[in-house]
Regions:
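Hydrophobic transmembrane alpha-helices
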Residues: 77, 136-150
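Primarily membrane-embedded glycan-assembly and transfer machineries that use lipid-linked glycans
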Residues: 1-133, 154-295
Length: 295
């Protein structure tokens, strides 16, 4: 077994142990599983949206189906819930980076992994969604606006993939709505009242949602036209309704989309990408001159 695999496994186990041990008692600083605690409280309560304002501790903002999938975990203790939940972001990170880049990925996303948010799961859904479009339902039924990545299928006229993504989402909503219609009626209200609501919080990128969204749209369109899949997770990150610094973790999803499984491959991608970017910038004046001449 390569030594890098062992280091990756040890780091994953050590991180999991730290998250589980440090989550109890809840509220100490620096705490772990802060976001996961919101899911746990919503799971135990009768009203999942009793706390539903961005910036408020333990605010739950995702669709009812998210809690319905977590239903079996309501019967375990808080620490038991964390023990189960903490496996998911670590597994997602391992999927996106592979064993050789796991330590780098963990260093870049440790706060997000420890907090228990779903950005890395969003990243997995995006990567998997190129092959199995139904995976986009996870994006649409949690963070919602990163679903702007579906423009990839629109621009490329991959209508079958788009329909699979939308129909799968509709089917999930139909089943879930039958179980909790009241919660589904409230969820859109929760979303509209919280979009971009990160003003004044130190942990949020100070760029309003409506400023970020056009760049996300343009990036997906450009990426789709030039067959650059790595643009989709970056656009999804830009389109997050509330962009916390932890949301930058979605960028890790670019690793498998550019074929980077080792440090050497990642370095090569970065070097070649930089050269391409410089070349594009240098070509701008020439293109503008041609357009003026043609006009």
């Amino acid at each position: 077994v390569p030594i890098t695999y062992l280091f990756a496994l040890l780091a994953a186990v050590a991180t999991w142990v730290f998250i589980v041990l440090w989550c109890e008692p809840y509220g100490r600083w620096p705490g772990t599983a802060m976001d996961a605690h919101a899911y746990y409280l919503a799971l135990l309560g009768t009203d999942p949206y009793s706390i539903a304002h961005v910036g408020t501790p333990n605010a739950y903002l995702y669709s009812p189906i998210f809690l319905q999938l977590l239903w079996p975990l309501q019967f375990v203790s808080w620490q038991g819930f964390v023990a189960a939940w903490a496996i998911l972001p670590l597994a997602a990170l391992a999927y996106l980076t592979g064993p050789r880049l796991f330590l780098l990925g963990l260093a870049l996303t440790l706060a997000e992994v420890a907090g228990g948010n779903i950005e890395l799961l969003i990243g997995v859904a995006i990567v998997v969604g190129f092959r199995w479009p139904a995976a986009w339902s996870f994006v649409l039924l949690t963070k919602v606006t990163p679903g702007i990545g579906l423009l990839w299928f629109v621009v490329r006229r991959e209508w079958r993939s788009l329909m699979i993504a939308l129909l799968a989402t509709a089917a999930v909503v139909a089943v879930s709505f039958a179980l909790q219609p009241d919660a589904w009626i409230r969820w859109p209200q929760v979303l509209t009242s919280n979009t971009g609501a990160t003003k004044g919080t130190w942990a949020a990128v100070p760029i309003p949602f409506l400023y970020r969204l056009p760049f996300a749209v343009l990036l997906v369109i450009w990426g789709a036209r030039t067959s650059r899949r790595w643009t989709v997770p970056i656009a999804a990150m830009l389109a997050l309704p509330a962009l916390w610094y932890g949301g930058l973790a979605i960028i890790i999803a670019t690793f498998p989309l550019v074929g980077a499984k080792t440090w050497t491959e990642l370095r090569h991608v970065l070097v070649e990408g930089w050269k391409e970017l410089v070349g594009e910038v240098k070509a701008v004046p020439e293109r503008l001159a041609r357009r003026r001449t043609a006009a």
